[in-house]
Amino acid sequence: MNKVLITGATGQTASYLVEYILKNHPEYEIHCTRRWRSREENIESFKDKVIWHDVEMKDYFNVFGVMNKIRPDRVFIYSASSYVRDSWAQPWIYMEENVSHAMHVFNSVLMINNIDFETLQVKLDYNPKIFVALSSEEYGKVPWGTQLTEDSPLAPSSPYGVSKVALDLMAKVMYESY
């Protein structure tokens, strides 16, 4: 059976993804992460239909433990601090959380594959597809009606946007390197 891991599944966007997969891909075993303090209003429709893992995504060993235990075929990283206005008050939290959550997933895959950190050689016996949730905030303030593509210039205008650009670039580096 194919396994999917969705981090931050109690959030608005990730909860829609869970509902979509449940409806359209019943062949998937769905694993979701949540924090002990997660609000549950977005998950009422599927709370008992998925396998929950209480994970603090800032804690690498928590993330590694879940990744190593279930070895998902696909990982959707939605866990993040996502309030643009609040990012101005605590920009370091946004940078740390929004990048480290994904880095812990990436590094878990490398560790499961026994990467040699001296030579950076890794034999990818376990190679899940990893999807990272990004944001239009990466492009900053653009004129109304402007069509954005992945090739549009990155010009974040908030600490939250900067954290998502850093995440975007790190995901690209990891993809191209491994």
Where are these regions (language model features)?
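N-terminal Rossmann-like NAD(P)+-binding domain of SDR-like oxidoreductases, especially those catalyzing
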Residues: 1-178
